[in-house]
Amino acid sequence: VDTQEPQFDGEKVILPQATHEAQKAYAASGMLSAAQDYDIGGMQLPYTVEAAANSFFAMASVSIGSGMLTTGNANLLMVHGTDLQKQVFALNEFSGRFSGTMCLSEPQAGSSLSDVATRAVPDGEGFESDALGPRYRLKGNKMWISAGEHELTENIIHLVLAKIPGPDGKMVPGTRGISLFIVPKKLVDTDGQLTGERNDVALAGLNHKCGWRGTTNTLLNFGEGKYPVRGEAGAVGYLVGQPGKGLHCMFH
């Protein structure tokens, strides 16, 4: 797949057919949930064995490694998510129906996460009582996001670091103010079914790579208004864990 660079046609990312087939084969192998318990479809493999098994896939193509992002995303939710977040998001990632990303860096904030500028504000009255978690609207940009946009799975579940402004409307400085949010590409209901509404997450561009092109590397815009939700700009996100504890969750 390294000979066929991903293309963006303005609406969706086009990847080689081989990448689609590899993604399906990897999910069918059960490796996405290999280290999980039997009762959620796992094999209960030790992490060392899981890592060794993944080396065989890496030998075929490192590009299939994007599946490990999905596993990491779901593993985080199994520890820090609510029961419904686990059911709706994590289990669908383990099955391969959904895929996952981790959105930390921004154009102006690579490894310096204290400079994160993506904002998250409460989404109207009753935002705290949403069944999927306290509901916020996110606005900002995330850079160098692997597998951030594609058509390989039914949905993409972004885990996004953002700051909730204080009562004075200002961002809390440093990493203390960073929270973690689930931001699905396509909105879902409490049964994990797609509602038919696209979330306000848009691909701004693909980063060109020297190799490993089977996995896209992206710049994503959250909340720019390209896909308004209920007539408003702002990507809908659900809080994971406690406000201000985003790095603690993300570095699980």
Regions found by a protein language model. Give the residues of each.
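A short core secondary-structure module
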Residues: P134-L194, R198
